[in-house]
Amino acid sequence: MKAVKETLNNVRYAPVSTPLGRLYVAYRGKAVCCVALGSDGRGFERVCERVFGIRPIRDPRLPEDMAKQVLDHLTGRRRFSGRIDLSHLTPFQRRVLRKIRTIPTGQVRSYQWVAKEIGAERAARAVGTALAKNPIPLLIPCHRVVRSDGRLGEYSGGGPSVKAKLLAFEGVDPEDLTRLRSRRKIATGRRRKGGADRPVPVA
């Protein structure tokens, strides 16, 4: 019981206003461990309870450095460079999410590309499953991963409509993705003659 209480006391959360709306951020120490957009405080507590099995403690505001890094990331100033806690995930899930963090703003990749990049070329479906369990959407931008046929696919942070909104916010027109796929502009990880596909900016 003592260990449970200590864990509970170690997970805290607070809201931050962003260009996309109110974002709730949970953290352990200086590491972000869960985020959700457009929720309310009680709803976010339930999200954390599903992920960690506990409810976090609410703070009035995020630590200043953490809030600045979150806002810089969401406004495109710089990629989030703060600490992220993925310790509750499997090694495969962590590999997938770390690779996702390297996808630049305004670009997309396919599930197949991610699978190949982490050395599991036939595991595109498992990549999708790992992304569905992403506890830190936006900061780990799983919305930038789409199907090889140009369709958006699912999104753990609120479904395809939210995914489309996030891509549009970053300058990607979701309606163009199918056309771009027909021109091989969505990186799939498949090899062409003479070398590998290179990821190409969508814009």
PLM feature spans:
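Basic nucleic-acid-binding alpha-helical/helix-turn surface characteristic of O6-alkylguanine DNA
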Residues: M1-R122, F169-A203
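Short glycine/serine-rich loop segments
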Residues: R122-A164, P174
